């Protein structure tokens, strides 16, 4: 599992001693056969569950997502956003071409995130779309403004120590590209 690195970081951060669990699953899609490898960090802490539930983070959260974002202290908002980008986001750009930051989540969470960004920056350059018009519960927040994307990613990854390596590396690539081509000294 290429994303196992974040589980190891979380495991170290909370002092969890149990080993990660590893799973393989055979998947057939059309005439293609795949083997999916997954890693899990299993934590059995009722206190941690209760603490997370206070913020609306519950089992099957992607479908329910009842986060009370106003209860998240502002100094932790970008850590929270990093978790969302790592889990359900995409950072993409082409040299000399387009830049995109997308987050796919519930429509309610997309609206809440967009409002929080507006409160912090005075406006938001994210726009909300529904990729599947028949599924209005899910939405995509997308930003294409290279300066806005840079601002968001800089605050999101500044002083971060827990992140998905592949997303962090994408951020570093974008940062270098942006600072080389667009940032004014």
Task: List the model feature ranges, each with a label.
Residues 1-185:
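Internal intein/HINT superfamily modules and their associated LAGLIDADG
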